A protein has these predicted regions:
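Short, solvent-exposed mixed-charge patches
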Residues: 334-335
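Extracellular glycoside hydrolase catalytic/binding regions
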Residues: 23, 92, 98, 104, ...
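Residues within well-ordered alpha-helices
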Residues: 36-37, 82, 234, 280
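Short, solvent-exposed turn/loop segments enriched in Gly/Ser/Thr/Pro and often Arg
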Residues: 52-55, 192, 294-301
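Substrate-binding cleft and catalytic face of glycoside hydrolase catalytic domains
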Residues: 37-117, 122-134
């Protein structure tokens, strides 16, 4: 990290632009991962791949109706192969711990193991925690007691599981990584399902260790994302001071495909015009925000591709592919 930009080991500025390749967060074996990664890099011109993973699969505990008999060894080796595919092609890999709610002790344990595994590969970036939400900024940063726990197997609803849980906070995840000796670049999502970065410019920025490659902040945005604030407060204020990584961004075809989106959230955007898709890519390009389009999987919406022949979706994938190829998009309206 140099100011609000990323530089490589030769002090050249790096602008990460790529794709989020999903399935290892819900499947111990993944869906066509070793086929999708080369296509994303070689044919879609991604210089970065985001790889969501889950700590239960990593440690071989199973989940999502699946069991593992090898203690997670085959899962970890598959991640190794994906990392190698990216490294060999000159691309970066973002290892995303795909958890929701509040950082917990098991998430720190994951990073103690995963960071040690990849600490000698500087092209691996550690995204500490997918989407924090429903906790105050002091707990987000420093940990503390929760009014209610969260079940991160419930991806959308995030239903309450245990009351009285204690979050370790995001700083503890940073410390877990650095405690292994790993100096890899770290990415940390804000509150509001990683939409709200207002706290990091108001006293809650995380602290790196001397020699660490730095911390960038993660922003997730979709047409329904607003949570009472626009782009200026949610991301641009932070972008003036810190590198930003938009690790999830996606346009949708119709509201009814996403039943969890409330009517009030639907009113904020007319998705039929495709204006949001153009404007968000324009915002990213105008501010040189790092980004990975969500999702390079045909059934994980909002989808960049419509099938396993990697046909771009008309409502999102075509624009993502154009942007990755260098086509400029005009920001007509800031939300």
């Amino acid at each position: 990290v140099v100011g609000n930009r990323l530089h490589d080991g030769h002090d050249r500025e790096v602008w990460l632009q790529g794709l989020c390749i999903d399935s290892l967060e819900w499947s111990a074996g993944g869906d066509r991962m070793l086929h999708s990664v080369p296509i994303a890099i070689d044919l879609w011109h991604a210089n970065c791949v985001r790889l969501p993973v889950h700590q239960d699969f990593w440690f071989g505990r199973g989940g999502h109706g699946q069991t593992q008999s090898d203690g997670g060894e085959s899962y970890r080796k598959l991640v190794d192969r994906i990392v190698d595919e990216c490294t060999q092609r000159g691309a970066y890999l973002v290892l995303d711990l795909h958890a929701f709610g509040a950082p917990m002790p098991e998430h720190a344990l994951f990073w103690q193991d995963a960071a040690a595994r990849y600490k000698n590969n500087p092209t691996v970036i550690f995204e500490l925690f997918n989407e924090p939400h429903d906790i105050p900024w002091p707990v987000w940063r420093n940990g503390g007691s929760l009014a209610a726990g969260h079940d991160d197997q419930q991806v959308v609803q995030n239903t309450i599981k245990n009351s009285g849980d204690h979050s370790v906070g995001m700083q503890a995840l940073v410390d877990a990584v650095r405690g292994t000796g790993a100096m890899n670049l770290i990415a940390a999502g804000g509150l509001g399902w990683s939409y709200d970065l207002s706290g990091v410019v108001n006293g809650y920025a995380l602290t790196d260790v001397p020699g660490g490659h730095g911390i960038m902040y993660v922003w997730h945005t979709y047409p329904w994302s607003h949570y009472g604030m626009g782009w200026q407060k949610s991301v641009l204020d932070a972008a003036a001071r810190f590198p930003i990584f938009v690790t999830e961004v996606g346009n949708i075809r119709r509201w009814e495909d996403f039943s969890f989106i409330g009517k009030d959230q639907q009113k904020c955007e007319d998705i039929t015009t495709m204006a949001w898709a153009h404007d968000i890519l324009g915002l990213i390009q105008q501010n040189k925000l790092n980004w990975t389009g969500f999702s390079f999987h045909p059934t994980c919406g909002p989808s960049v591709i419509s099938d396993w022949t990697y046909t771009p979706t008309s409502y999102w994938g075509v624009f993502v592919k154009q942007a990755l190829a260098g086509q400029p998009f005009v920001l007509a309206r800031v939300r």
